[in-house]
């Protein structure tokens, strides 16, 4: 079938959407306003490429920013292209990099079982390093150190380069020293943090040209969603992959760039046409989600910004209701107003899940949550206590991580005396010191505990722990047990349920949680079939975000920060604390660049409503 005939299959799309779908060759920037059907365009563009037989399905790479978005994209692609849709690479940056590193990480010194450290693991590691260096946390807070390390990795700076940059800045020089030890300890533990996954993939491509050639030959068409949220490393990654065919399509909106604090650089999207030779740009300005009153407000807010591509959103949905402003006496009055408005709406036939309450800072949530609880309004705080952050879940996952990678010192230290085995903190500290001196892992040291005088008194207990872990590793490697069965072996061999019953408060709830983890493992095995091994499961949960677990079908109103709500939509949105000093925040009001970002945040949050918007700004 010739391309002109195939194009008739896409008559349901508007003219600009069709232009974006049919423009398959060369660099393309799709400047997609909120609610303009960008996912529809991505899905149909992939379908068009495959229907025209321009490549094989596995030659398409589609990158999104959340697992939830990647899953939805893959599902829609499979529905649009039943034959071969499942073979497309549709994943997040981190998942894509993890897949490459699991296969070729040995070329830069990692095994295929490397561990991914989350925020809590990173904090624990940095705290240990500060103790080692005799630096007080008050003088150099852990959060600040990790932020500086992340910024350095975004710029692909090594610890040595960071130290040179510091020059006469003693604080930054100290952080560079922590960074150096941090990276050494990660490597010894066969572990990476999230930034490393991107940096190490770029490093792999730059040091192993044969691997870069393999992947840039494979991916004839590359598509990146939410391009305005990319950082320098992500730009480097996709530009390397696109360097052969040049068929890179990025979808984004410079007016929705709101993650500068996470390292996102708006320059990636603003300079796209200069960076990629002969690039084209197509604007998607028709909005299918909101009403014109909402769009007028959003357009007016963002028009005050400088350094933007420029676009004007419009819709055929009609004018709709006007934005409503409620002026509250104080935060308690504001919270009570929100709760009562929700109750009134539900009495009129709305669902609790129609409502979202957004705020600039987490500190604003307490008064609102209390008012909702007093009023009996069911609610959920997105960004609150995640399932995988619960103590008992972290314990069980730590056991699985150590079975997968016994050299993971952070996870091993967590469970070496849980449940209690008479292995005290002093013994673990001695083992860690010996390991650091030898450049080995704690596991390597305690396997030979009898050879070290500092460990001799505890050697029998340490050897018993090693025997437990070795037995579980052997069970995992034997292939005789499913993942769920292996998990049950861990619970059984550690007597973990008994430990919860005798040592912890609320044991029934905690046992329910570890049973829920078992259910999650069973579901993972059902979903992934032959690919459902231990490494894959641990990778899956390490890359999850709270938004990935958001259940749109649950009839509860949701509370979250403005940044957390990106990509979601609700019929009724409350924007709490929209007052000078709060939103925009005091810190941004004297800095033009920061104020531009704050306007972009206001622009984005005005566009969270669909399809009958009723926004409330309380001030």
Question: Where are the regions that the model predicts?
Answer:
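A basic/glycine-biased coupling hinge at the interface between accessory DNA-binding modules
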Residues: 2-8, 25-28, 33-36, 47-221, ...
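Helicase P-loop NTPase motor core
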Residues: 34-42, 46, 277-280, 285-378, ...
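Short alpha-helix plus adjacent loop in nuclease-associated cores
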Residues: 97-102, 256-259, 383-402
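Conserved phosphate/pyrophosphate-binding and hydrolysis machinery centered on Walker-type P-loop NTPases
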Residues: 14, 63, 90, 115-119, ...
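Short glycine-/polar-rich loops that comprise or flank the Walker A/P-loop
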Residues: 55-59, 86, 244-246, 254-255, ...
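Conserved helicase motor core of SF1/SF2 NTP-dependent helicases
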Residues: 36, 224, 228-307, 311-316, ...
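Conserved helicase C-terminal RecA-like lobe
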Residues: 168, 351, 365-377, 390, ...
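N-terminal pre-P-loop "Q-motif" helix
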Residues: 10-24
